[in-house]
C-alpha cells in the first residue's frame, strides 16, 4: 500500500455481537497481501435509523458492508438502501439460513444472538460442575451459602454423584456429610430450609453398599463403617439434623441417581 493511502474499510453490521461477521471478514482479508483492511464493527443494529447511518458512513468511506442480520425486515431494508446508495454489501448469514431452511424444511427462528445464549448456557454448566467438585463433601463451608442447593446425609447416600448430575442441569450444588461426632457447619442452619435436601436410606441397603465399598478398598466388612448398629446410629443422628433444619427429605433407597436427581429438580423448581 502506498504511504499515506487510507486502508480499505469494511463495516461489519450485526443485530447481535458481530463477532461472526468480523471473523469471516478477517479470514478473507488474510488471503491478501499488503497492509490489510480496517474493520469497523457496528453491533446490535435493531432499527432502520442505525442502518441509514451505517450506509452513509460506508458511502463516505467508499467501504463495503458485511452483515449478519437475522431479522428479515432489517436485512431487507439494509439491502434495499445500500443498493440505492450504490454501497456494496455481503450477506454472510442469509444464504446459509436459506439453505438450512430448505434442507430441514423448517423456518428459522430469526432471533439475534442465539449462539451466544447457547455458549452462556454451556459455561453455566461448566461453572456448576466446577462448583460441585470444589464444594464436595463439606470441604469448604463457604460453598453452603453460595450454592443453589445443599444436599445432606450420611456417607454413601449418593451426595457426590447427585451433585454432579444436578450440575449438568446448571444447578450449583454443595453437599455436607452428617457424622455424629462432627457438628454440621453453622452455615447450614442459616439457610432457607427450601435450599437444603436431606437424603435418607434404609439401614439394610446402606449396610450392603458400605460393605461392598470396604471390599473394593480391600478392608474387612466387619469394620465399624459397615456395622448395622453404627449405621442406625448415624441415620438417627442425620434424621435429627434434618428435622432441626426443617428441610425436605428424600428416601434414596432402591433409587437410581437419575431418579433422585429428577425428584430434586422438580422440588427445587416449585
From Swiss-Prot:
Disulfide bonds: none annotated. Keywords: Kinase, Nucleotide-binding, Serine/threonine-protein kinase, Transferase. InterPro entries: Kinase-pyrophosphorylase, PPDK_reg. ADP binds at residues 153-160. Bifunctional serine/threonine kinase and phosphorylase involved in the regulation of the pyruvate, phosphate dikinase (PPDK) by catalyzing its phosphorylation/dephosphorylation. HAMAP family: PDRP. Belongs to the pyruvate, phosphate/water dikinase regulatory protein family. PDRP subfamily. This is Putative pyruvate, phosphate dikinase regulatory protein.
Amino acid at each position: 500500500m502506498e504511504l499515506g493511502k487510507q486502508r480499505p474499510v469494511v463495516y461489519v453490521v450485526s443485530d447481535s455481537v458481530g463477532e461472526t461477521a468480523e471473523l469471516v471478514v478477517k479470514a478473507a482479508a488474510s488471503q491478501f497481501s499488503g497492509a490489510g483492511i480496517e474493520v469497523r464493527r457496528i453491533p446490535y443494529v435493531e432499527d432502520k435509523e442505525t442502518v441509514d447511518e451505517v450506509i452513509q458512513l460506508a458511502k463516505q468511506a467508499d467501504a463495503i458492508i458485511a452483515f449478519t442480520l437475522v431479522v428479515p425486515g432489517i436485512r431487507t431494508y439494509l439491502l434495499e438502501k445500500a443498493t440505492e446508495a450504490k454501497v456494496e454489501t455481503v450477506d454472510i448469514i442469509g444464504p446459509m439460513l436459506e439453505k438450512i431452511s430448505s434442507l430441514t424444511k423448517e423456518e428459522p427462528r430469526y432471533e439475534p444472538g442465539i449462539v451466544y445464549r447457547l455458549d452462556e448456557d454451556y459455561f453455566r454448566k461448566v461453572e456448576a460442575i466446577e462448583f460441585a467438585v470444589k464444594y464436595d463433601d463439606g470441604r469448604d463451608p463457604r460453598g453452603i451459602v453460595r450454592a443453589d442447593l445443599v444436599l445432606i446425609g450420611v456417607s454413601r447416600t449418593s451426595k457426590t454423584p447427585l451433585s454432579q448430575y444436578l450440575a449438568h442441569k446448571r444447578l450449583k450444588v454443595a453437599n455436607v456429610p452428617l457424622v455424629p461426632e462432627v457438628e454440621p457447619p453453622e452455615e447450614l442452619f442459616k439457610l432457607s430450609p427450601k435450599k437444603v435436601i436431606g437424603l435418607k436410606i434404609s439401614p439394610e441397603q446402606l449396610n450392603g453398599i458400605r460393605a461392598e465399598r470396604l471390599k473394593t478398598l480391600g478392608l474387612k466388612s466387619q469394620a465399624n463403617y459397615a456395622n448395622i448398629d453404627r449405621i442406625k446410629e448415624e441415620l438417627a443422628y442425620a434424621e435429627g439434623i434434618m428435622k432441626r433444619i426443617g428441610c425436605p427429605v428424600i428416601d434414596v433407597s432402591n433409587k437410581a441417581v437419575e431418579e433422585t436427581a429428577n425428584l430434586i429438580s422438580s422440588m427445587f423448581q416449585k
